[in-house]
Amino acid sequence: MLPFRSYVCEPLSWGRLVLAGDAGHTVPPTGAKGLNLAFCDVRALVPQIAAFFADDARDSAPLDEYSRTALDRVWRAQSFSYWATTLLHRQPEENSFTRRRRRGEFDALTLTESGRTCFADAYTGWTV
C-alpha cells in the first residue's frame, strides 16, 4: 500500500518564476482535486501574466497576487482532501474507538441533508 501524500509550495511565485498545478501543490486522489486545481491555477494565472507583461517595469505584483489567490483555494482543497482521506480510508493503527467514531461521522454526513449539502459543496469546489 502506498501512503497518500500532500504538498504545498509557498509562495507559488518568486519574481518571474511561477508554479501551477502539481509543480506547486499535490493532493491525494481521494478528493479528485488535482486536475481541477491545475485548471483553476491556469485560469487565475493567465490574467496575471498578461498584467505582468503589460507593465514595462515587469513588476512581479500580479504574479504575487496569483500566488495569494491560488494558495487560498489550494489550502481549502488540501483541507477537504485530508478530511476525505481520513474519513474514507482506515488507517493500519486505527483502534475500534476511532473506527466507530469515523463511522459516526460518515453517517452524520450521509444521513442528513445538511451533511450531504456540506459534502457536495466541498467536493465540487468553490468559486474561482
Task: Please place each PLM-identified region on the residue numbering.
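Short acidic-hydrophobic sequence patches enriched in Asp/Glu that either
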Residues: 34-41, 58
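Extended, folded domain segments that form the structural surfaces/walls around functional sites
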Residues: 12, 39-50, 54
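C-terminal helical "tail/cap" subdomain of flavin- and related membrane-associated enzymes
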Residues: 32, 47-128
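FAD/FMN-dependent oxidoreductases across multiple families
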Residues: 1-37
